Amino acid sequence: MQNGFIKVAAAVPTVRVADCAFNVQHIENMMAQADGQGIEIICFPELSITAYTCQDLFSQQLLLDEAESSLLKLIEFSRNLNVTALVGVPIAYNSMLFNCAAVIQRGKIHGLVPKTYLPNYKEFYEKRWFTSSEALGEGAELRFCGQTVSMSKYLLFQSSHCTFGVEICEDLWAPAPPSNYLALAGADLIFNLSASNELIGKAGYLKNLILNQSARLFAGYVYAGSGYGESTQDLVYSGRAFIAENGGLLAEGERFAMKEQLISSEIDVDRLRAERRLNTSFAGAIKIERVPLMRVVDLEAYTSNVPFTLTRPIDAHPFVPEGEALDERCEEIVCMQSEALARRIEHTHAKTVVIGISGGLDSTLALLVAVHAFDRLQRDRRGIVGITMPGFGTTDRTYTNATNLMKELGVTIREISIAPAVTQHFKDLGHDINVHDLTYENSQARERTQILMDAAGQMGGFVVGTGDLSELALGWATYNGDHMSMYGVNASIPKTLVKHLVAWAARNMADEASRETLLDIVATPISPELIPADENGNIKQVTEDLVGPYELHDFFLYYTLRFGFSPQKIYYLACRAFDGTSNGTAFAKEIILKWLRVFFRRFFTQQFKRSCLPDGPKVGSCSLSPRGDWRMPSDASSEAWLADLNVDDESQI
C-alpha cells in the first residue's frame, strides 16, 4: 500500500469439475503470480476448490474430503507468500453443508464466511445441497484443515491497510445484501466470490449492480466469477470479473476468454473513507439499520518487498469529462447557471442585468449564461447590459472580441473608459502612475466594479459576477473589486472547465460570426490586463505565469476540497497525472511541487475573500461558498500543510 492505495485482484482460474487437485494447482499458480505483482488481496470465484457445477456430487463425502485436503495444501502453499487469498469451498458442519469463502494468509485460515442467500428458482437449486448462513446464528467454531476456525457471516477482516468483508454471488442480488451491513460496520472493501451463469443482457445488469453497490456503500468492490471449465451441461459461465470503487469501474475481465484471467487495480482507501466522513447519511444509517455486531479478525501485516506501482490512470482534469459526456455536461451546467440566474431575475424584478465584458473567458461565460437565461424567460436580450471598460492594460484583441461578441449576441453595449477616473484617483492618492504595483492594479479593478454597481442601480438591475472557482481558491481577485458582484454565476466553475464551456457554446449556441469570436476568446491567454501591453500590443500580464497553470491548480483544488487529501498524497497523484502518459500536460516533479506550495499558501491566506462571497449557484461537487460547502476561518495557518511537503528527498512523497 502507498498513499492510501491497496492493490487487489480478481482471479478467474481454469477449473475441472470435481477435480480439486487440478483446481488448487491453478489457484496456487495465480496466487504466486499475484504475489509477484505486489497484490495484497486476491479473490477467486465461488466454490473454486471444487468448481461450482458439481451438483449432487456435493453430497459425496469423497468430494468434501478432497476439498478439505486440497485446501490444506493451498494453505501450506500460502505460508511463504504475502498475498491474502479468498477461495470458495464447501464445508460440512453439524449435518449441514455450507457454501463458504475461506480467507487464507501465510499458512492459516483466518475465517470462513458462508453464503446467506441461496438461489432456488429457475435454473438454480442451491438449497438442494447447501444451507444458509442464517442456520448458524451468530456463527460457529469448528475444526477444519487442522485448526479451529470461525465460520460466520458476521466477520470482518482487518489488515494493516484496510478492513474488508465477504459476500457470495446471490448475496449481492438480494434486496438486503450482507455487504450493506459489512460496509456500515467498517468494511472499506467488499469481495464477492461468484458463479453467476451467463444470460442475454445479464452482464450489463450485473456490472451496473456492482457499480451501484460500490457507490451506495462508498466502497471498493471486487467480483470474481466462475469461467472456463465449469460444466456447460445446461448453463454457460463466462468468467466475469470486476474491480469497482465508489461507482467507478477500475478493471474488468474479458468475457468468454477460454483462459485464466487475473485482473488487478489499486483501490483508494483514503478516498472511500473521506467520502464516508463527508456523507452524514452513512453514519446515520449505522444507527437506523441497527448494524449487527461484527467480529473483527486481524490479519498479519503485509510486508512484500515488491515495489508498489500505481497502474490505474489518474485523470489530470477531474472537473472535465471526456468524450460525449463533455457535451452533455456542458449543456447541463449552462442550463443550471441560467436557471439560477433566471430565478434571481424574477425574484428581484430586475429590469436588466449588468456584466463587465473584458473579452476574457469568465466574462464571456457569464454573458452566455445571461443570454440563455433571457431567452428562457422570453425577454429581450437588450435587457442585458454589457459594459466594456478599457484601461491601461487592455489589448486590441480582447477589446475587439468583447465588442464583437456583444454585437453578435444582440445585447446592449456600453463603453466606459476607466483611465480618466483612475488617473484622477492616483493623483488623489499621490500614487505615481508609472509604478505598476498592487495599488496600480487594484485601483483599476475597484473602479470597474464601482461603474458596474452604479450602472446597475441606474438601470434597475443587478451586477452579474464573472469570477470562477479557481480564482476564488487562489484569491486571484481584488477584494471588493472583481471579487464583488450581486450574483456570481461562475462561482463554482473551475477555470479548466470554463474554457470547455465557452468552446461548447461556440459549437452549440453560436452563429458563424459569434463562433469565430468565441473560439478566439478560448485561444486568448488568461490575463486580468491590469499592466500595460508590451511594445507589440500583446498581453504582458499572463496569469498562469504569475500564479501557476490552472491545469495544476484545479487538480490540487479538486483533491483538497473533494476528499481532503494530504499535500503529500496530492503531490503523488499529480506526479502520476502529469507525467506525460495520461491526459494532462507533462510537468516536471519540481514544477508540480513549486505550484502546489503556492496553491496551499494562497488557499489559506486568501480565505478572507471567500468569507464574504455573493450568492451564486453550486453546479458541481466542489464549491467554496461560505454558506454551503466550505466554512474555514480566515486566520487559519497553512504551516502544517506546507510542512507536509518539506522533505529532503522528494521521491519519498
Predicted regions and their residues:
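ATP/NTP-dependent adenylation/nucleotidyl-transfer catalytic domains that generate, transfer
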Residues: A18, S160, A219, Y228-S231, ...
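Enzyme catalytic cores with a strong preference for nitrogen-chemistry domains
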Residues: M1-V354, H372-R381, I413
